[in-house]
Amino acid sequence: MKQPSSSVRGKGPAKAKARRKTREELNQEARDRKRDKKHRGHAPGSRATGASASGKSSGQSTQKDPRIGSKKPIPLGVSDAQETRPQKHQPQPKSEKPMLSPQEELDMLENDERLDALLERLEEGETLSADDQAWVDSRLDRIDELMQQLGLSYDDEEDEEEEQQEDMMRLLKGGN
């Protein structure tokens, strides 16, 4: 009752048995494989030619060799080199602070509110932090430098006061 069906057994129609190859056919296939195997790999001289051979096969235009430089003639004489190359002026870096004359800088330092406040604290006997003390010292040193440049000194002011007192004494004494 049960009959074997061909569709259940195989996935398609029944195949005929494959016939065995003869020794000549096997030898011919082996020779073909050997010939194909010989031609595998890179072509001779491919290291030297390199990218140009692969570039042509891909259809791109030929690439320029990066090792070859400019064709522009280079002058070998000293005088020629100076004439052809214009001298470039490098711009000087601008300082953050505008350049002030020594008198203007001295006036600015004397009117500095932070310096005045720190000097008042020092006169009152307070001790300043190391940063504040270093800043005050640097400002006072700069004031001294500027006064020396301008030819001013603290002694000049004291001398002027003494001279004024002497002049007043002369006027009071008798007028010569």
UniProtKB/Swiss-Prot annotation:
The keyword RNA-binding does not apply. GO terms for biological process: ribosome biogenesis. Pfam families: YihI. The lineage of its organism: Bacteria, Pseudomonadati, Pseudomonadota, Gammaproteobacteria, Enterobacterales. Belongs to the YihI family. Residues 12-21 have a biased composition (Basic residues). Interacts with Der. Keywords: GTPase activation, Ribosome biogenesis. HAMAP family: GAP_YihI. This is Der GTPase-activating protein YihI. Residues 22-33 have a biased composition (Basic and acidic residues). One of its GO terms (molecular function) is GTPase activator activity. Residues 1-110, 151-176 are annotated as: Disordered. Residues 154-166 have a biased composition (Acidic residues). Residues 43-61 have a biased composition (Low complexity). A GTPase-activating protein (GAP) that modifies Der/EngA GTPase function. May play a role in ribosome biogenesis. The gene is yihI.
